[in-house]
Swiss-Prot record:
One GO location term (cellular component): sarcoplasmic reticulum lumen
Annotated Gene3D superfamilies: 1.10.268.20, P-loop containing nucleotide triphosphate hydrolases
The organism's place on the tree of life at top rank: Eukaryota
Region G2 motif, annotated ranges: 127-128
Topology versus the membrane: Peripheral membrane protein
Protein's gene: Srl
Signal peptide location: 1-20
Region span, G3 motif: 189-192
InterPro entries: Dynamin_N, EHD_N, G_DYNAMIN_dom, P-loop_NTPase, TRAFAC_Dynamin-like_GTPase
Protein name, as recorded: Sarcalumenin
Region of interest called G5 motif, as start-end residue ranges on this chain: 277
Region (G4 motif): 254-257
Region G1 motif: start-end pairs: 99-106
Length: 472
């Protein structure tokens, strides 16, 4: 018994001495200079934040008066599953962090915001530590917001997340932090991808939630650890979801100072070899190679290269912040183009149905024939003949089988019937927004003009603005 007691005391002393050595080592570990972060992101400037409220109010008015009526009338949200809220229009740029588990996503956010060793820092560790979707926003003081509260707040852009169920809302957390960078951008940390875990075990539709954030992100950081490149089925699914968003994707090879130069080159090549089948674009996404954490780079590594890569990433982030309004207006205009094309297609389906119907026809069979083979009735070719319709913007034909499967054709009116004496025609209003109102609003930002005032420089007040997008 005495020997056992002595053994326990000996082990305890070893643990305490080991812990003391770790603490001493962490205290002695030099921290790198952070001045380049504040300088590149212009966080040291005392100038007041730009007031974009007038532009955003004008943008919101254009959306509600010129785009949303046609969108609701032809149930566009049931085709694309992307409902635009006022909170999304007025929201700050969103930066999304994706990648396998324990690659340094949370550590990178802590580093960019300088949250290490503060009560604000995100929990990090070698094991999978993030099981929630964590949204970091600006606030006057540190505050944690439950997911169910975020979804219920219509002023925020997260109310549509309610459709993913209560199990997901329990895995959604908002954190308000009084940080200058968060006045201009919102960070979203995500659970790491674990290849040996089935999606069903999460208790909510993980891929669908990721798609929701991907569709709304202005910048997407896909983070990898060079010491464990594991490209499996879940990561393959993630890159499928990123199709069409290649311009927003930035791949980060984190913890690069853990490898020697030759090994780092091999890992860089192996990463592209693994991702090549998943990224089918001519120009690959930008890859940043660095180490995003507060400790200094390890000796005998390419610290100058890593620092330049980090500054390039910060410049990329700052560019997204600076172009916030331009990106928002371009996004709403692209949304309006898709809504217009959808309305034209539904109108064409309906017109074809009316043309083919006779007194003795079975309406259900007639419309089923049209939906099953729209090319037989020149549905899509007719729409391509319209002004300002690109074949690259046309939705998938298969999507309309599902759309009309839950929305009977009898629920819709022809576009020619969507007019009123006071309100005008829905189609004319959305076309005016696409060709005149939104380009004019975009031009007013660069010229520093009041977006509410008419622009008379080119057309002269009282004259009809020329359609710059119409072919002559």
């Amino acid at each position: 018994m005495k020997a056992l007691l002595l053994l326990c005391c000996f082990l305890a002393s070893l643990l305490l001495s080991g812990q003391a050595e770790v603490e001493d080592a962490s205290e002695e570990a030099p921290l790198r200079d952070r001045s380049h972060i504040d300088k590149t992101l212009m966080l040291n400037e005392d100038k007041p934040a730009d007031d974009y409220s007038a532009v955003l109010q004008r943008l919101r008015k254009i959306y509600h008066t010129s785009i949303k009526p046609l969108e609701q009338s032809y149930k566009y949200n049931e085709l694309r599953q992307h409902e635009i809220t006022d909170g999304e229009i007025t929201s700050k740029p969103m930066v999304l962090f994706l990648g396998p588990w324990s690659v340094g996503k949370s550590t990178m956010i802590n580093y960019l915001l300088g949250l290490e060793d503060t009560r604000y820092q995100l929990y990090t560790g070698a094991e999978p530590t993030t099981s929630e979707f964590t949204v970091l926003m600006h606030g006057p003081k540190l505050k944690t917001i439950e997911g169910i509260v975020m979804a219920a707040d219509s002023a925020r852009s997260f109310s549509p997340l309610e459709k993913f169920g209560q199990n997901f809302l329990e895995k959604l957390i908002g954190i308000e932090v009084p940080h200058k960078l968060l006045e201009r951008v919102t960070f979203v940390d995500t659970p790491g991808i674990i290849e040996n875990r089935k999606q069903q075990e999460r208790g909510y539709p993980f891929n669908d939630v990721c798609q929701w954030f991907i569709d709304r992100a202005d910048l997407i950081f896909v983070v990898f650890d060079p010491t464990k490149l594991d490209v499996g089925l879940e990561l393959e699914m993630l890159f499928r979801q990123l199709k069409g968003r290649e311009s927003q994707i930035r791949i980060i090879l984190n913890k690069a100072d853990n490898l020697a130069t030759q090994m780092l080159m091999r890992v860089y090549g192996a990463l592209f070899w693994s991702l090549a089948p998943l990224i089918n674009v001519t120009e690959p996404p930008r890859v940043y190679v660095s180490s995003f954490w507060p400790q200094d780079y390890k000796p005998d590594t390419h610290r100058e290269l890593f620092l330049k890569e980090e500054i390039s990433l910060l410049e990329d982030l700052n560019q997204v912040i600076e172009n916030r309004l331009e990106n928002k207006i371009a996004f709403i205009r692209q949304h309006a183009i898709r809504v217009r094309i959808h309305a034209l297609l539904v109108d064409r389906y309906l017109q074809t149905y009316k043309d083919k119907m006779t007194f003795f026809s079975d309406g259900e069979l007639v419309f089923k024939d049209i939906v099953e083979d729209p090319d037989k009735f020149y549905i899509f070719k007719t729409i391509l003949a319209k002004t300002n319709v690109s074949k690259f913007d046309l939705p998938n034909r298969e999507a309309y089988k599902d759309f009309f499967g839950i929305n009977p054709i009898s629920n819709f009116k022809l576009l020619s019937q969507q007019c009123s004496y006071m309100g005008g025609c829905f189609l004319e209003k959305i076309e005016r927004a696409i060709t005149q109102e939104l380009p004019s609003l975009l031009g007013s930002i660069g010229l520093g003009k009041n977006p509410g005032a008419p622009n008379c420089d080119k057309t002269g007040c009282g004259e009809t603005p020329k359609n710059r997008y119409k072919k002559h």
